[in-house]
Amino acid sequence: MTKKILFNDKYSLTQEVRYGNKTMTRRLLRDNVPLGNWEETAKHLSYKVGEVVAIAQSYKSIYAEMIEDFAKHNYHTPREDAAENFRKEYENTAGWNNKMFVKAALLPHHIRITDVKVERLQEISEEDALREGIEEFCFDYFLPNDYSKPFLMPRDAFAVLIDKVGKKGDWESNPWVAAYSFELVD
């Protein structure tokens, strides 16, 4: 069974993954406690090294990609019919607008988990903050697709981002996280 992973769209993190600008993600550990040793903790992580995971997106965005792909390559029927059939089948489902309800097997884009480590949230390095999608421009750092407030260091921008995509206070509480590195497969 294929698993899926969700990224925050409000801050364009799904897009950042698809463009190769985000190659790392942190997920809170359940119960915020590592299980004593690495082997025990690793058994309970959501994703394993080498695992291929689908990138969650809504059926509507999958349909839009199909139409864009057909237009770009000047495809005509039966591919246009396939897109229309897809739309008819899924546009009245919960997954049309909400990627949480989309079947992982239908998702067209995937990542491969290349590394995982367990650490406190604030142990993130400057380099890893950049891999989380923080953008560098000139001598400043910014949240993904938001150039309204510059930060001096990538970690500073990441601290703000994590409180926006999670809940306010996540950075300050410094929870245990699984830090997954990944590469885009398709």
Where are the regions that the model predicts?
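Secondary-structure transition motif
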Residues: M1-D186
